Each structure stands twice: as structure tokens, then as C-alpha cells.
């Protein structure tokens, strides 16, 4: 028998997986540190303050997430962010060694930079794979 004990609130979440996908939806935390050695990272409708996402082999996909500061690192795999908020004021640095960078459906070759006018930031570094950012 299972009994509901109410909501669980966590201000910080640190998660490391060796093999397997990570799917999180509706997460609301101040600090997220997520590392996946082999497997995809999928976040949907999450509210995050400071976040670090690291995938060795696997895709990273964020949909309708909000954040103040996010750093994403990928060795092999695509990174796709579809944000529900306007990031034009954010400091943004995107770069890939092998692959394409697209921002709002505009091809940017292998890198993109926006200085922004706020303290909010997004940094994505990818060794092999595409980066797509839509806001």
C-alpha cells in the first residue's frame, strides 16, 4: 500500500548517472547539478536558478524551462533548448567543435555570442554535435 505524504521540496539537486536517460518535468530548484555519462538528459517545464548539465555521450533537450544561470557541457550529442522566456538580455556563449549552431532558426556556423544587459547567463560548450537555441 502506498500513501501520499504530500509534496517534496528540494532546494538543491545533484544527480549523476552512469548509463541511462534522465527525464525531469516540473522541477523547481535553486541549484541543479546533473551529469550523465551515457544517456540523454530531457528537462521539461522546469524552473531553475543556477544549473550545470554535463553529458558525456547523449543528447540534452530542454523545453519550456526558465533559468537565471545555466552551463551546459556535452562531449558527443546534440543540445537543443526551446525556451519560453526571452533570452535577448542574457549573456550567451555557444560553441561546438564539430557541428552547427542555430539561434532562433538562424545558422551561426560553430559559435554564437550575445553580451546581454543582465546578470543572467547561458553557456553551452559541445565537442561533437549541434546546438539549437530558440527563444
Task: Give the location of each predicted region.
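Single conserved hydrophobic/aromatic residue that forms the stacking wall/gate
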Residues: 1-9
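Short, surface-exposed interaction patches in beta-rich subdomains
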Residues: 25-27, 31-33, 41-135
